[in-house]
Amino acid sequence: LTLERAELASEKGKGIKKDFKHNDFSNTTIIDILNEETAEKLGKAVGRYITIEIPELTFLSSDLPKIVETVKESLDLLLPHKNGLVLVAGVGNSDITADALGPFVASKILSTRHLSEDLQRSIGFSEPLRPVSAISTGVLGQTGLESSEYIKCIVNEINPCCVITIDALASRSVKRLGTTIQMSDTGIAPGSGINNKR
């Protein structure tokens, strides 16, 4: 987690900016890494990182609608504000529970790229849906392809305005497991949480 690296480094000054938001069900930390020197110290790329900590993150939570809205608002800070195609890429190994988040989420995405506006109207949508495509990349041991190779090929073919990549996240604290969402506009390094960088 970028939040943990910033805590460990106790980084202050011109190279980093932190903002905090708190409500009755979550804490959100927005960290902007502003220059290469700070990025190198933290081992993270220059960009924005949003960490949402939700102690009661379950599908059974009575706060679920508010949690979804909080995640949406944070995602809106990172996404381009236009109606272009979004590619959602779930990375990870669906056969290993701790690494299955990406493939699981990708399987739940409503893909709309193939739906014409006429068809959308005929099935009851009053406003056109944003075009979305979703894939699950698998892992090198399953496919013989690095996730990044697979995603790059698809990006070159369908030319989305952005890619949302979903992956499991490593944390130093057990309290953050299953309760923390990190988003960034910098991309990810699959496997980096277990020092598996290629």
Role assignments for model-derived ranges:
Residues 155, 160-161:
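Proline-aspartate-enriched helix->loop->beta-strand connector
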Residues 124-155:
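A structural-propensity feature for long, helix-poor, extended segments
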Residues 1-46:
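N-terminal amphipathic/basic leader segments beginning at the initiator methionine
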Residues 91-101, 141, 168-172:
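Gly/Ser/Thr-rich loops at beta-strand to alpha-helix junctions
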Residues 135-136, 149, 165-198:
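A structural signal for small-residue-enriched, beta-sheet-centric alpha/beta enzyme cores
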